[in-house]
Amino acid sequence: MINITLKDGKVIEVEKGVKVSDIVMKISPALYKKAVGAKINGEIAELMTEIKEDSELEILTFDDEEGRKTVRHTSSHILAQAVKRLYPEAKLAIGPAIDNGFYYDFDIDFTFTPEMLEKIEKEMAKIVKENLEIERFELPREEAIKLVKDASEPYKVELIEDLPEGEVISFYKQGDFVDLCAGPHLPSTGKIKAIKLLSVAGAYWRGDEKNKMLQRIYGTAFLKKSELEAYLKMLEEAKRRDHRKLGKELDLFTINEEGPGFPFFHPKGMVVRNILENFWREKHTKAGYDEIRTPVILNEELWHRSGHWDHYKENMYFTKIDNENFAIKPMNCPGSILVYKSHLHSYKEFPMRLGELGLVHRHELSGALHGLMRVRCFTQDDAHIFMTKEQIKDEILNVIKLIDSFYKVFGFEYFVELSTRPEDSMGSDEDWEVATNGLKNALEGAGLEYKINEGDGAFYGPKIDFHLKDCIGRTWQCGTIQLDFQMPERFDLTYVGQDGEKHRPVMVHRVVFGSIERFIGILIEHFAGAFPTWLAPVQVKVMTITDSQKDYANKVVNDLKEKGIRVEFDDRNEKIGYKIREAQLQKVPYMIILGDKEVSENKVAVRSRKEGDLGAISLKEFVAKLNYEIDNRIVENSK
């Protein structure tokens, strides 16, 4: 007999070699119906896994991220099996679970059409109904290669040949379908009650543009049809809010073929951008930050010294100046470090907070580019803080409070993750432990719940990630706090302590928006282009019913401009109904409609985007209303 410790601390005794599924049934038949996987001693496992020693056991359901991935990973195999049944000539590439769904890449001589997707989806439904048992088996390298060669699957051969010697090579079988896969998977295909194929796109094999273009079928899966219906409804709403569409319609930005991944901000987009940057400066000045600016191009040696060369060079751009190799910076931290090193520092200056709205460039594959959300050049709202070890907790708490104060202004809820040491990290175990505990202590001191994201820290230190939740339930990773003992060591940073001796400072890297461009994209979608008054590129649109009101309208426009209001005058010879509809499409917060009555009474008829017709009021009263919204950064309900 062995002892199994459950997540709630309860210990149960079971027979050695018992399957997880049998333990779940023993715990609760209701839980058995919901269970999709497990964690054994912190490692992801399947319900079919046998436990042979005392272990800690956590049962995973679809409510858990790892549980959803298991369901969707199995769904990708169901997709591949359906395609192979219908189109046996298709060659299989890869098919992982991804955020909110799954995909599978196929090599086939024709393009999948919407009608074909419907046919594939029906075949997938048959496979689910067949409730095929899913079995895992392992093979030695040579036998594994023979299996996939005999099946005429060249991409699988390449994957196996690239595995390190001694690596476990596993396959999963459901009915007559076999696929190379590390898992995990469900016990059978019948557990999945709702699958939907969403789209087809091109994808280069292994993401390399030099390789063959494959066809990628995207889909999603749920255990309940009602959950799938809600998700599809959210996707429709997301299309309506797509920042790429709205960015063009509202004349905010474009991305041109002359510069893929390099956004062009138009005048109205620059208004939004400048407001955000000035807001950032205002908040940071009050919080004790000093702003700096560092060069975009720095020599190659600097990136070797910082460690970015070893960990990041595939994402960097390079150039040559006077026969010397230079790199376009992918991050701002080395420049900030050089500012710190420009003279000697005392502990009395700590914590030293250096902020920078720094332009960085990172090479992204063309297939990964997506409007403002995934670009090749962007502005990071970085700050680097230098401090003593004793100041870690208090300073991280200050940063957490600062980030929280930013997100509250926009009405965002958020959740927090603590990302720990990755495999390709640098530095000692002791430094990583101190850094990780420092972040944990600060999070607990702030009273924030957080999730551990194992192995997803930066190469130089652990980090706290802030994930914003938008009005349709999607999440976006924005703010980050990273604790770093490595850069100060690599650059030999020092300060003079109370004892008069030189000591090594601790460094914090942190962002609030993350990327100005991406944050603007998030705001466009969150507000569906209807920015709150303080952020709107045009706050007021003035329009006349006939030409006889033009002189009065010009006076109103000039008065508003003098008071700092962003106003446009629509003096076109069009019907007033047409002008109103145009302003509504441009999502202007307020319209002023002027007729003879308003001129004679020296008033303005105001129409609000949110509240509708507000009637005729004095310009002074209207400006007071505007200023209240602007000064207090009022945010309307964005739904």
Swiss-Prot record:
Residues 242-532 are annotated as: Catalytic. It catalyses: tRNA(Thr) + L-threonine + ATP = L-threonyl-tRNA(Thr) + AMP + diphosphate + H(+). Binds 1 zinc ion per subunit. GO terms for biological process: threonyl-tRNA aminoacylation. Pfam families: HGTP_anticodon, TGS, tRNA-synt_2b, tRNA_SAD. It is found in: Cytoplasm. Keywords: Aminoacyl-tRNA synthetase, ATP-binding, Cytoplasm, Ligase, Metal-binding, Nucleotide-binding, Protein biosynthesis, RNA-binding, tRNA-binding, Zinc. Belongs to the class-II aminoacyl-tRNA synthetase family. This is Threonine--tRNA ligase. It comes from Clostridium tetani (strain Massachusetts / E88).
